[in-house]
Amino acid sequence: MSRFLICSFALVLLYPAGIDMYLVGLPRIAADLNASEAQLHIAFSVYLAGMAAAMLFAGKMADRSGRKPVAIPGSALFIIASVFCSLAETSTLFLAGRFLQGLGAGCCYVVAFAILRDTLDDRRRAKVLSLLNGITCIIPVLAPVLGHLIMLKFPWQSLFWAMAMMGIAVLMLSLFILKETRPASPAASDKPRENSESLLNRFFLSRVVITTLSVSVILTFVNTSPVLLMEIMGFERGEYATIMALTAGVSMTFSFSTPFALGIFKPRTLMITSQVLFLAAGITLAVSPSHAVSLFGITLICAGFSVGFGVAMSQALGPFSLRAGVASSTLGIAQVCGSSLWIWLAAVVGIGAWNMLIGILIACSIVSLLLIMFVAPGRPVAAHEEIHHHA
């Protein structure tokens, strides 16, 4: 079992590493490519667009051909794209490389969640996804630090060579450690069960909405945090970095505590707790009389996301034993596109950073609480399948 957990964690971590590691080198990248930093900030959106594009086909391929046939080319593409970015001499080529990086990371991301659905029952999957969420929270803190250390001795291109090395490690794991987990193709008599795993299932759709809103909350916070903390609250850049490191610490603490909480409380209880924390955070930020209270509200955001997201993802994947790849893709596309759409629309309409965050917190909590209380799971399905090792 440990091989599947190690491979799944490695496959997922390409996604945040591709976002965070290069940011520290952005000024030098812009100077060398004769582009402004503002022009290159679109590289974040281009990367997410690549991920979303990969998710359109990766899930279906993983269900038809297997997990390894998607993980291997996905990690290989991430390696090639990282090298391409390091060799880029214009901003256009650099952005093209970032899109390809997103394609590779998206393939690996989808496969990771499909593997966990294949190999773990509901309760263990919820615990593992909570742990995975905690590990993912470490990357935004460690990646810029690692990038800074690399750039003390080497040019910015070395950041992408470091990403390529990460991709090589994932490729080696996919080739030599990961074993195929896709359930054997169903017999004709099992076709009705395959067809019953509909993406239009009310319970699945409710969890898609909940996880998409939750991701929108956390990405809104990440995107607005420089404005909130430095421009509105007046913190210096060093203080901002310290606060963000502390919020990552809060996220990790609650993520690593959630598996123990699942041994005591029902998953539904933790999901309700998560949304209550979001609601409390929104109210706290709305009425905050001081910076200290506002910072407390921010910690509630991190705690709420960490307590509930892994549980909600596990519940979303639960009904799908034969279509776990497609379900994972659907979740990923909804989360990436939904959160990006909200942030874009709020910016176009002219909603300020503070109100943008408060609005999504309150909307997420109210909608999610209603869905948790009134949309119950359908008929029980097999928690997980026996692993068939394909030649």
Swiss-Prot record:
It is found in: Cell inner membrane. Pfam families: MFS_1. Residues 1-3, 59-75, 120-130, 179-202, 266-268, 314-330, 377-391 are cytoplasmic. PROSITE patterns: MFS (PS50850). It comes from Shigella flexneri serotype 5b (strain 8401). GO terms for molecular function: transmembrane transporter activity. Belongs to the major facilitator superfamily. DHA1 family. MdtL (TC 2.A.1.2.22) subfamily. This is Multidrug resistance protein MdtL. SUPFAM superfamilies: MFS general substrate transporter. Residues 25-37, 97-98, 152-157, 223-244, 290-292, 352-355 are periplasmic. It is a multi-pass membrane protein. InterPro entries: MFS (IPR011701), MFS_dom (IPR020846), MFS_Efflux_Transporters (IPR050189), MFS_trans_sf (IPR036259), Multidrug-R_MdtL (IPR023697). CDD domains: MFS_MdfA_MDR_like (cd17320). GO terms for cellular component: plasma membrane. It comes from the Bacteria. Keywords: Cell inner membrane, Cell membrane, Membrane, Transmembrane, Transmembrane helix, Transport. The chain crosses the membrane at residues 4-24, 38-58, 76-96, 99-119, 131-151, 158-178, 203-222, 245-265, 269-289, 293-313, 331-351, 356-376. Its main location: membrane. The keyword Transit peptide does not apply. The lineage of its organism: Bacteria, Pseudomonadati, Pseudomonadota, Gammaproteobacteria, Enterobacterales.
